């Protein structure tokens, strides 16, 4: 039963839910702590209050953290708070005792707690108390050795089921696939409380028809997601083609597909036979002549209809290929055939577990998995119930507090369950975590444990346990939070993401930043196919440019001083999913002389200096390995040239090994004497090192090679010397660590290295950069978890998700078991089984869910500003993103499951919000009002072409040409001039069809209206419109001191765009500071001050309109729009081709639900003698009547509500615009 929570005093820094998290007790409590919500501070404060307020000894609390570093930090924080409390209450004996007991406090990782448990109760386990923890190298080699021996034993027995298994999972060359499968099954099984029991039940679904039926229903539900999307796409296609004429062939194809879907989906259960046998038309009928010559709207309708058909076809094909390439009966039949193989594979893995454990016991070794399983053996009796020792710990610990609970696995959950008190309704377990940041499934973390409690527990604690949501974020600016919220509102739900992103899950702004806008930047790079750089290299250059912009144009707000400062390189971090592109990014920063560091866990073995030493070690172990032998000879140590190596090979081209060729060359009388001497010296070296390796450990062999050839000195003296030296010492230290294990010798060390390389597990380059070094850092999203940075560049959004696990021969799932295809030994063909297709479908959904959570972690690292970097091959891809359909306020489930990259989800969501031209069915919301303030994204979508970026860094040769050069060139190209003249003089035969423009700005409509009233020919207006296009002024003109009127107008609009609206009005000093800031940020030119009309701005600040805006509820600036003119004119049924109206509204504000727009005018006008203000106002209203009407009608069309407006003339004042 929940105990009373003390009343929160006024003025406390804790939020209501933080306060509740600190003091609630009496039942199990789950704190769902969103990113940046201060969970660590809350956890420490809870511990302190349990000690001070409840007078619980600190050693009566068990605090479990995810890492040793977190445990150390938490213990230090608790110790510091106890000291502070002791100083405040010097006579408090309880606090004095805690100063002593803090050193025995159980604040540690669960592994550390398990280790202590084993050390205290080793007698229960019947193990030697002098055990030691195995090293990584030792564990890897010992497991490899165990698998070798177990497989050898089964090869001797040659059971028929084992033969079938090896036929399925081995190749003609080796059984690596079988070995890797056994290893994966080993790691999966030991993540369960009872590994052997888990293995034993793997074959049950293959034998039990009721479980097979359950699997089929699960697969049917997953496939139905795609079939429903296919039905929707087909209906859209059908509706569009039914609008067109002379498309009978196309409609016939669609009718056939509609009949197929009706039969395949009848009754809600998919007809797998129909799906498996269905064949599409080989080609969709092409457009006929009439369609090709139809108007643009009809052609667009045809193209859209064809696209929907293609989408339909892709969705059904997905179901055919991945789910039901065979009908249900066949899928189930092969399950029965697979049962013996699965059972035998499970038995082989069980044999590996048993023998691996025996090997570890004989060496008196324990690994981290043993920690957990031995702890369970201590805490559970033979019946699986808590033991007497577990009861003892239940009585000892008043409360168990678990940090990062979302990363718990099933074994750890069982350990905690053994030592906690009571049930969920009256327990003493306090858990903190965020399932949206559960990104360690590859370590067997099980987010379903968190999700289960999240769904069971209630906010009032009336049933089961209590759930408390910490949603207020104290890390990031509002723009980061609201944009993240908006993305995940439309991206994450129970279907994909495994949790609903609702009001409870979203982030709420709580940091004391100022209100200067810091929009999230979504920067899309369009690749240049003609560039010498590939797409990844172009993106690396794009990232460098972004860093340069941050350094030159941005500032950082210091919350403590409430002042801005210039950024340093260390304020910038680049986050990527992996280190796959780290080398290219590193090279780009090197090319631009920007300090950069990547503490990569990948690429260590690819470093030149490391490859040299590994080639040396492999050659000493076995010189009959050509790649390593030749690599060593060509290295800087021995410096054999390619000509020398080719001469050696030419002498004996038929030798199997290059080592033999060396011997034969040296024995040849006509060989080059100088080269023979060089080879003799080299072989003498090799033989000496081989002799040395027989009697010395590996690390001494490496050390001798370093000293003999001055390896450290050489690599220290070249570019990147500090890092290279660290890498060489790192390899030496690994050799020392290896020799301290139970394995010895050069061969075993090389095998250890090979296993690491094969598993993709690098040592990582040695870290030579400290936290205060001023460098741009690159790290993976995983390594950034728990950290925060002022500027985050989240790049690599266009790189594909890792789907390797979906293509493994065996797919494992903690909840469902093992899925594998059926291999027919006789026909040498493989067929999908019910388990293989179902588990693959589940794995695909879980994979995308984890990738979503990685995106969430990346976005929420940013404090000041977030930059998203994507890359596409052409603009068409971006347009296609906008056309992605919408389903129940989300991207369709089928679309999300099959998403290939982060950008596939991020761009469509943000682009749809930004676009004002999409039809309603492609939008998430119809109006701005539909978006809650906490969900409203503040984002700028920027599209850049790499060719433009590249040109910025290349000197423009044309600037160096003289007038004489141009004149000379002009005289030499008369033929070319004639050709150009003919092309430019070409007259379009269908000129009348384009007299009406397809797109017009509001200003153009205004000019058209004015010319119609004055009988001006429309051709003249059109000519004027084209001729008045504004181009950037050339460099020699832009140096002119005097700006033109239109340039001053643009300058004034820019200042007004950034002008703050304060209720107590800005001072002249405030305006001057604003202008200085705009100049410093390169938003306006340095010489702008001389042309800014400050008096006009001061007058505006003093106006009633300024005050009205300042007191409004919401303000939006510089809003672009593109709308259909027929919709604005309420003429939707017009058969005429509609024009598109585009424009930019200076400002919109909302006050008490009423929308207003404001249009600033810098126009000069003549005040005639004796004209009153009313007459001038009427004249100005008339002049801008058309433009303002279009603004108002456009906004009313978009917002679906009444809109009023104001014209503000800097030389006159405000004029209201109403309907």
Swiss-Prot record:
GO terms for biological process: double-strand break repair via homologous recombination. CDD domains: DEXQc_UvrD (cd17932). SUPFAM superfamilies: P-loop containing nucleoside triphosphate hydrolases, Restriction endonuclease-like. GO terms for molecular function: 3'-5' DNA helicase activity; 3'-5' exonuclease activity; ATP binding; ATP hydrolysis activity; double-stranded DNA binding. InterPro entries: AddA, DNA_helicase_UvrD-like_C, DNA_helicase_UvrD/REP, P-loop_NTPase, PDDEXK-like_dom_sf, PDDEXK_AddAB-type, Restrct_endonuc-II-like, UvrD-like_ATP-bd. Residues 478-786 form the UvrD-like helicase C-terminal domain. One of its GO terms (cellular component) is DNA helicase complex. PROSITE patterns: UVRD_HELICASE_ATP_BIND, UVRD_HELICASE_CTER. Residues 997-1016 are annotated as: Disordered. It comes from the Bacteria. Residues 1004-1016 have a biased composition (Basic and acidic residues). Keywords: ATP-binding, DNA damage, DNA repair, DNA-binding, Exonuclease, Helicase, Hydrolase, Isomerase, Nuclease, Nucleotide-binding. Its cofactor is Mg(2+). It holds the Pfam family UvrD_C. Residues 12-477 form the UvrD-like helicase ATP-binding domain. ATP binds at residues 33-40. Its EC number is 3.1.-.-, 5.6.2.4. The keyword Nucleotide-binding applies. The heterodimer acts as both an ATP-dependent DNA helicase and an ATP-dependent, dual-direction single-stranded exonuclease. Recognizes the chi site generating a DNA molecule suitable for the initiation of homologous recombination. The AddA nuclease domain is required for chi fragment generation; this subunit has the helicase and 3' -> 5' nuclease activities. NCBIfam families: addA_Gpos. Belongs to the helicase family. AddA subfamily. This is ATP-dependent helicase/nuclease subunit A. It comes from Staphylococcus saprophyticus subsp. saprophyticus (strain ATCC 15305 / DSM 20229 / NCIMB 8711 / NCTC 7292 / S-41).
């Amino acid at each position: 039963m929940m105990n009373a929570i003390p009343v929160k005093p006024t003025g406390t820094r804790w939020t209501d839910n933080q306060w509740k998290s600190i003091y609630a007790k009496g039942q199990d409590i789950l704190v769902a702590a969103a990113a940046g919500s201060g969970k660590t501070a809350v956890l420490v404060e809870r511990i302190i209050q349990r000690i001070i307020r409840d007078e619980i000894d600190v050693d009566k609390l068990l605090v479990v953290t995810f890492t040793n570093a977190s445990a150390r930090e938490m213990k230090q924080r608790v110790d510091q708070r106890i000291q502070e409390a002791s100083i405040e209450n010097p006579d408090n004996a309880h606090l004095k005792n805690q100063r002593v007991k803090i050193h025995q406090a159980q604040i540690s990782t669960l592994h550390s707690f398990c280790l202590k448990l084993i050390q205290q109760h080793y007698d229960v386990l019947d193990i030697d108390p002098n055990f030691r923890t195995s090293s990584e190298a030792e564990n890897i080699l010992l497991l490899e050795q165990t698998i070798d021996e177990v497989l050898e034993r089964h090869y001797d027995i040659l059971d028929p089921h084992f033969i079938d298994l090896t036929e399925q999972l081995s190749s003609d060359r080796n059984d690596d696939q079988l070995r890797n499968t056994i290893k994966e099954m080993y790691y999966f099984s030991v993540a369960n409380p009872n590994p052997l029991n888990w293995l034993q039940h793997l074959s049950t679904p293959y034998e039990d028809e009721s479980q097979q039926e359950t699997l089929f229903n699960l697969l049917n539900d997953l496939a139905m997601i795609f079939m429903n999307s296919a039905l929707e796409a087909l209906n859209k296609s059908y509706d569009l083609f039914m609008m067109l004429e002379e498309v009978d062939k196309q409609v016939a194809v669609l009718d056939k597909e509609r009949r197929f879907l009706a039969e395949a989906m009848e009754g809600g259960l998919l007809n797998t036979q129909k799906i498996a046998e269905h064949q599409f038309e080989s080609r969709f009928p092409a457009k006929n002549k009439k369609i090709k010559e139809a108007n643009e709207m009809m052609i667009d309708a045809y193209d859209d209809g064809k696209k929907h058909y293609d989408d339909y076809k892709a969705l059904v094909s997905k179901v055919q290929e991945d789910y039901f390439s065979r009908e249900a009966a066949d899928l189930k039949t092969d399950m029965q055939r697979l049962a013996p193989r699965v059972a035998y594979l499970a038995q082989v893995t069980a044999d590996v577990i048993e023998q691996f454990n025996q090997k570890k016991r004989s060496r008196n070794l324990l690994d981290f998995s043993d920690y957990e399983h031995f702890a369970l053996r201590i805490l559970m009796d033979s019946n699986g119930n808590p033991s007497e020792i577990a009861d003892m710990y239940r009585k000892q610990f008043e409360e168990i507090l678990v940090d990062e609970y979302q990363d718990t696995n099933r074994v750890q959950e069982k350990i905690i369950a053994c030592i906690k008190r009571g049930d969920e309704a009256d327990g003493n377990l306090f858990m903190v975590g965020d399932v949206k940041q559960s990104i360690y499934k590859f370590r067997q973390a099980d987010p379903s444990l968190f999700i289960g409690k999240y769904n069971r527990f209630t906010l009032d604690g009336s049933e089961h346990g209590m759930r408390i949501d910490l949603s207020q974020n104290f890390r990031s600016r509002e723009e980061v939070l609201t944009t993240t919220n908006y993305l995940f509102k439309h991206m994450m739900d129970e279907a994909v993401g495994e949790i609903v992103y609702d009001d409870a899950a979203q982030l709420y702004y709580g940091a004391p930043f100022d209100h200067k806008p810091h929009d999230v930047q979504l920067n899309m790079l369009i690749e240049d196919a003609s560039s010498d750089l590939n797409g990844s290299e172009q993106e690396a250059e794009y990232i460098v440019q972004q860093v340069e912009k941050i350094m030159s144009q941005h500032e950082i707000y210091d919350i403590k001083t409430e002042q801005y400062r210039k950024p340093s390189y260390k304020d910038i971090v680049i986050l990527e999913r992996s280190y796959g592109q780290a080398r290219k990014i590193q090279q780009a920063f090197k090319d631009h002389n920007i300090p950069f560091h990547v503490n990569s866990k990948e690429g260590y073995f690819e470093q030149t200096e490391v490859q040299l030493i590994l080639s040396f070690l492999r050659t000493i172990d076995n010189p009959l390995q050509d790649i390593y032998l030749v690599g060593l000879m060509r290295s800087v140590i021995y410096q054999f040239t390619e000509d020398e190596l080719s001469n050696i090979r030419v002498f004996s081209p038929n030798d199997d090994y290059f080592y033999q060729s060396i011997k034969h060359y040296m024995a040849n009388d006509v060989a080059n004497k100088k080269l023979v001497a060089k080879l003799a010296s080299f072989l003498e070296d090799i033989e000496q090192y081989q002799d040395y390796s027989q009697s010395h450990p590996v690390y001494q062999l490496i050390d001798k090679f370093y000293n003999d050839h001055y390896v450290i000195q050489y690599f220290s003296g070249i570019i990147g010397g500090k890092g290279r030296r660290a890498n060489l010492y790192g390899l030496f230290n690994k050799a020392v660590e290896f020799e301290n294990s139970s394995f010895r010798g050069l061969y075993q060390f090389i095998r250890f290295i090979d296993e690491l390389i094969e598993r993709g597990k690098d040592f990582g380059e040695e870290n030579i950069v400290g936290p205060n070094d001023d460098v741009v850092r690159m790290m993976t999203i995983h390594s950034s978890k728990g950290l925060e940075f002022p500027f985050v560049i989240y790049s690599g959004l266009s790189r594909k998700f890792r789907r390797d696990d979906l293509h493994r021969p065996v797919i494992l799932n903690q909840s469902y078991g093992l899925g594998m295809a059926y291999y027919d030994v006789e026909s040498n063909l493989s067929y999908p089984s019910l388990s293989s297709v179902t588990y693959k479908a589940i794995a695909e959904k879980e994979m995308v869910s984890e990738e979503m959570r990685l995106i969430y972690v990346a976005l929420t690292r940013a404090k000041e500003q977030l930059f998203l970097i994507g890359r596409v091959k052409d603009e068409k891809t971006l347009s296609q993103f906008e056309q992605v359909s919408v389903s129940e306020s989300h991207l369709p489930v089928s679309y999300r499951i099959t998403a290939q990259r982060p950008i596939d989800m991020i761009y469509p969501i943000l682009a749809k919000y930004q676009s004002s031209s999409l039809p309603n069915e492609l939008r998430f919301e119809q109006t701005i009002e539909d978006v809650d303030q906490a969900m409203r994204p503040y984002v700028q979508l920027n599209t850049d072409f790499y060719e433009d970026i590249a040109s910025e860094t290349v000197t423009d040769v044309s600037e160096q040409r003289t007038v004489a050069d141009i004149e000379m060139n002009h005289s030499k190209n008369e033929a070319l001039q004639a050709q150009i003249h003919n092309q430019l003089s070409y007259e379009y035969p269908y000129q009348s069809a384009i007299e009406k423009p397809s797109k017009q700005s509001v200003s153009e409509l205004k000019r058209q209206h004015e010319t119609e009233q004055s009988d001006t020919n429309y051709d003249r207006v059109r000519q004027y419109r084209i001729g008045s296009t504004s181009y950037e002024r050339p460099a020699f003109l832009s140096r002119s001191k005097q700006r033109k009127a239109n340039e001053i107008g643009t300058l004034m609009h820019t200042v007004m765009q950034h002008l703050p609206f304060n209720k107590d009005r800005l001072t002249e000093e405030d305006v001057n500071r604003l202008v200085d800031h705009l100049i410093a940020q390169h938003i306006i030119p340095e010489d702008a001050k001389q042309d800014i009309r400050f008096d006009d701005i001061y007058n505006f600040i003093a106006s009633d309109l300024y005050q009205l805006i300042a007191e409004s509820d919401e303000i939006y600036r510089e809003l672009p729009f593109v709308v259909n003119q027929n919709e604005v004119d309420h003429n939707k049924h017009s058969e005429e081709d509609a024009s598109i109206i585009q424009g930019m509204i200076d400002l919109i504000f909302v006050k008490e639900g009423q929308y207003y727009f404001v249009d600033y005018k810098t126009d000069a006008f003549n005040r005639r003698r004796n004209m009153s203000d009313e007459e001038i106002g009427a004249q100005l209203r008339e002049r801008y009547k058309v433009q303002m009407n279009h603004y108002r009608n456009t906004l009313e069309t978009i917002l679906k509500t009444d809109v009023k407006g104001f014209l503000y003339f800097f030389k006159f004042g405000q004029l209201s615009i109403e309907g």
